[in-house]
UniProtKB/Swiss-Prot annotation:
It is found in: Periplasm. The Tol-Pal system is composed of five core proteins: the inner membrane proteins TolA, TolQ and TolR, the periplasmic protein TolB and the outer membrane protein Pal. They form a network linking the inner and outer membranes and the peptidoglycan layer. This is Tol-Pal system protein TolB. It comes from Brucella ovis (strain ATCC 25840 / 63/290 / NCTC 10512). Residues 1-33 form the signal peptide. HAMAP family: TolB. PANTHER family: PROTEIN TOLB, PROTEIN TOLB HOMOLOG. InterPro entries: 6-blade_b-propeller_TolB-like, PD40, Tol-Pal_TolB, TolB_N. The keyword Cell cycle applies. The gene is tolB. Belongs to the TolB family.
Length: 443
């Protein structure tokens, strides 16, 4: 069965940067991070960076530059300088710039580039990153792609700049799958949708005729698992994003809750509602469809998420009274409570870096998005309000996306926040949106 076919147009254009040719654009500066990211610092001073319009025969160069600048600015680590302050007009991006002109406006780094159309119709995108105070080129790269993938080129360039200046992998060349919500509150239509991480290129991947919830990416981002009430009972499906083909993962008696992939993509972990009203955590091996029960309690165990190495699982359980966070081995062994604060905890998700667990906390009439170390220590609440829920990690483990509903008759919206808790941004979507899940870096 096909639903919501997506033409990704990516595999034929990019494959792990295989189309990148950098032999003629060498890095001439020793590797070092210019921007220091310290999540305990509280306030990070953004790095002033000048991003010149890429030379091109049309508006495309300026469009690409705008996306690069928006990506970097939204991270909270960079402050793109207004183009009206530029002294030098770049006419040859291959030549060294007049560094003194850029130092005068306090540009710590400079980006120049060019877009040219090739005889075969493809685009060639080149860029260089300069250390203006050091007077040296830091990196230079070029890419080939089709014209309709220009936004993806911009995200890849922004990732390269981010990585070179921070020492961390970027997260801009990624996608987010979420639940699109439209219509009045009493008759809300919920469809699965996918978009670029900045809210562009929204595509619907379900038709809204059946309630669909909890979409989650596979580790290779080519598949999404989700729960659907098609036919009136909850079922878990696996959707191939490139073809639109889907298959039934399991048709279990009772409700199936919050399916999520293992890091190797070979299993799905989920909760199954039992006849006595309890819910326990199971895994299903996608290779042979065998299920294994991991918890056996009279409580509600749900919201399971693997550690990046696949050796542990964090989940929510009310076995001690209020919902709290627990960690156990991937085989269900040695469950132990890690959350010790007041209130209730839910929707835990392990950081891709392996160092933190994000969660939703309900306490004193507010819903907060927070993080803690994997042993439960160092709990920090990043944002609080009427209803914040459902954190998901960017693949570099530095930023979270979540959904928020304000008091009143409105609906949920998507936001991002970094680990300082100070850089919070709304992601614009066509309708109300909830339950986001961030993809790995695209390949």
């Amino acid at each position: 069965m096909k639903i919501g076919i997506i033409n990704t147009k990516i595999r034929t254009v990019f494959s792990a940067f295989a189309c990148m040719i950098a032999a003629s654009l060498v890095c001439t500066m020793p590797a070092r991070a210019v921007v220091e990211i310290n999540i305990n610092k509280g306030v990070i001073e953004p790095l002033p960076i000048a991003i010149t319009d890429f030379l091109s025969a049309d508006q495309l160069g300026s469009n690409i530059t705008s996306v690069i600048a928006a990506d970097l600015e939204r991270s909270g680590l960079f402050a793109p300088i207004d183009k009206g302050a530029f002294i030098e007009k770049i006419s040859n991006p291959d030549a060294a710039p007049r560094f003194e002109d850029w130092k005068v406006i306090n540009a710590q780094a400079l980006v120049t580039g060019r877009i040219t159309k090739q005889p075969d119709g493809r685009l060639k995108a080149e860029f260089r990153l300069w250390d203006t105070f050091g007077g040296q080129q830091m990196i230079g790269q070029q890419f080939f792609t089709t014209p309709d993938n220009w936004r993806r080129v911009a995200h890849i360039i922004a990732d390269a700049i981010y990585e070179r200046l921070t020492g961390d992998k970027g997260y801009f060349d990624t996608r987010v799958v979420f639940v699109d919500e439209s219509g009045p509150a009493q008759k809300r239509v919920k469809r699965l949708a996918i978009m670029d991480q900045d809210g562009a290129n929204v595509r619907f991947i379900s038709d809204g005729r059946a309630l669909s919830l909890t979409p989650r990416f596979s580790p290779n981002w080519q598949e999404v698992t989700y729960m659907s009430f098609e036919g009136g009972s909850p079922k878990v499906y696996l959707l191939q994003l490139e073809t639109g083909q889907r298959e039934l993962v399991g048709n279990f008696p009772g409700m199936t809750i919050a399916p999520r992939f293992s890091p190797d993509g070979q299993k799905v972990v989920m909760s199954l509602l039992q006849d006595d009203g309890s819910a326990n955590i199971y895994t299903m091996d996608l290779r042979n469809r065998t299920t294994t029960r991991l918890t056996s309690s009279q409580a509600i165990d749900t919201g399971a998420s693997y550690s990046p190495d696949g050796s542990q699982i964090v989940f929510t359980s009310d076995r001690g009274g209020r919902p709290q966070l627990y960690v156990m081995g991937a085989d269900g062994s040695n469950p132990r409570r890690i959350s010790m604060g007041d209130g209730s905890y839910s929707t835990p998700v392990w950081s891709p870096r392996g160092d933190l667990i994000a969660f939703t906390k309900q306490s004193q009439g507010q819903f907060s998005i927070g993080v803690m170390k994997t042993d439960g220590s160092g709990e920090r609440l990043l944002t609080s309000g009427f209803h914040n829920e459902g954190p998901t990690w960017a693949p570099n483990g530095r930023v979270l996306m979540f959904f928020r509903k304000a008091a009143g008759a409105g609906g949920p919206k998507l936001f991002t926040i970094d680990l300082t808790g100070r850089n919070e941004r709304q992601i614009q979507t066509p309708n109300f949106a909830s339950d986001p899940a961030w993809s790995p870096l695209l390949e």
